[in-house]
């Protein structure tokens, strides 16, 4: 599931990244918790993970929250409850509740004089301009995009895993550069997701890249409900027992660093890149100046 805000809010969000990124998490989590506990929809406590992204394919500013939501939850009797494969919350209701909660927190921060206003957001210091912004955003239909995991939960983890510890753009998308410009690949969603090349001045490329550096010590991956640190060990074990799931064993348990690199990136650091021979650790003796271990084939 993806929670997105209207682009009209981008200037004020960018001027207050820590506060208004946190507000995205607050609104998304409060929406999911409130609706999931409602007996009209599911009537259970659920678990989910939220991840903040701030970029679009062209490195434009596009703050939104990705969520991975369990397919059910625990009811008041600690019994597992789901809706038989269908998502238990109506998309339209999610979007409306999320809109109300986010704009309510934004208004509260403005009333408490906790917001800053820079660049194109300066005009929102004025009460009437800010009210017009809120009115415009209330009138809009917000987007809460939901999609089932066609290839299983692991495919979702693999997809989002590409972005959780990266920022904005990867090296392979940078096609070329000169002293003045940078050309990089972008996905054109208006043309069936076709890849095309975009060329921008070097300073503009750096500006776009730096827009997506998160605030210092900001936590982008957050766990809620049954998946929170407080509940995960006991309640998730209980859920697995109810569903008859096999005990989870980490794929990294008792593996060496080299084995984990092989598993994650399919790169064998123990294989010589020159001759293809197997590398073995070589520890220097006490007469060797270097104190570091070397790999030799």
Show where each model-derived region lies.
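Beta->alpha loop/short-helix hinge microenvironment recognizer with preference
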Residues: 2-297
């Amino acid at each position: 599931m993806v929670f997105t805000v209207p682009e009209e809010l981008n200037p004020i969000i960018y001027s207050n990244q820590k506060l208004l990124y946190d507000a995205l998490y607050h609104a998304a989590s409060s929406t999911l918790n409130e609706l999931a506990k409602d007996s009209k929809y599911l009537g259970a406590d659920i678990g989910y993970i939220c991840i903040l992204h701030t970029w679009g394919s062209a490195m434009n500013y596009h703050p939104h929250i990705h969520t991975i939501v369990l397919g059910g939850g625990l009811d008041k009797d600690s019994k597992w409850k789901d809706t038989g494969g269908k998502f238990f919350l109506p998309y339209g209701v999610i979007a409306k509740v999320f809109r109300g909660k986010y704009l309510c927190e934004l208004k509260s921060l403005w009333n408490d004089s906790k917001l800053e206003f820079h660049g194109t957001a300066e005009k929102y210091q004025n009460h009437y301009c800010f009210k017009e912004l809120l009115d415009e955003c209330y009138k809009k239909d917000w987007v809460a995009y939901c999609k089932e995991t066609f290839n299983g939960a692991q495919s979702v983890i693999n997809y989002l895993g590409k972005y959780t510890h990266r920022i904005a753009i990867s090296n392979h998308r940078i096609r070329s550069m000169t002293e003045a410009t940078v050309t990089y690949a972008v996905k054109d969603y208006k043309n069936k997701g076709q890849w095309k090349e975009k060329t921008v001045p070097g300073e503009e490329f750096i500006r776009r890249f730096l827009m997506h550096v998160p605030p210092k010590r900001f936590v982008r991956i957050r766990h809620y409900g049954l998946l929170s640190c407080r509940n995960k060990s006991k309640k998730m074990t209980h859920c697995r027992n109810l569903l008859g799931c096999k005990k989870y064993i980490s794929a990294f348990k008792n593996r060496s660093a080299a084995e984990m690199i092989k598993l994650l990136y399919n790169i064998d650091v123990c294989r010589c890149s020159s001759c293809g021979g197997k590398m073995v650790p070589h520890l220097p003796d006490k007469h060797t100046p270097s104190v570091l271990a070397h790999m030799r084939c």
